[in-house]
Amino acid sequence: MCHFTVSVIVPNYNNEKYIRQCLDSILAQTYPVKELVVYDDCSTDGSRTILKEYSEKYSNVKVIWGAKNVGVSVARDTAIRATTSDYVCMLDADDYFYSNTKIEKEMQNAQKIFDQTGKKVVVFSQTIDVDEGGSILTKLKPVDLSGNERFKIVTRRYSNYMPRDYCFPREYYDLCGGYTKNLALYEDWELNLKLLQLTNFVFSGGYGTAYRHKAGGLSSVNYKIQLETKINIIQKFQISSKERICFYAIAYGAFLKNEIKDFISHYV
């Protein structure tokens, strides 16, 4: 039996089109969600009306109304620090939980490991890529990521399986320092690296979040800026020589692959 309590936090900015599906997928979870904390970052669309509706209808839904636009990292950080549960899970307002047993499966793993070792871990599931309308783009077969999670996360070896929207111990967020608030790219990966200093990541074995691909996302950011950001992040952490060599090989390989792809699309 699982004894850990769970909160889910959602940063929102002008997601009127998607916010209902996001909130409904959280409220439909088979595992009880103690708190659903939404940070609204000064939205100017109808999402504020929707959030008021949900906060009035559901006693576990709490909305933090931002006084000024602060960006997603600060929004997440503020929402996380407002939670009081044992574990916290994050979900962006334009995404949704693909499976209504997502949190239950993750917490079963967390409880099992805690009962065996007395240690709290981060538990994640695999994502499914969907387009703006919610149609599935890719539904990759779940892979066994139950081995050396540290190596895979540090080196970004499997970018399609990079842990996101996972359940993590609330106390470890404070201990690791949380989000770096002025980081514009790869802030989630940096948080992964921080949490890795304290505990292990464990794969639940199933699907979790439907990740919505929209114009203006990371894929639209200059590849050189992406590479430089990843290098600046990894240099903050103590990692092994093997991890460092593999990271640079994979990072530069991805950069060159994208540059060649762009060259071919423009000139060939």
What are the language-model segments listed below?
Residues 101-137:
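Conserved donor NDP-sugar-binding/catalytic core segment of glycosyltransferases
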Residues 18-20, 45-53:
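Acidic helix N-cap motif at the loop->helix transition within catalytic regions
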Residues 1-27:
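N-proximal low-complexity "stem/linker" segments adjacent to membrane-targeting elements
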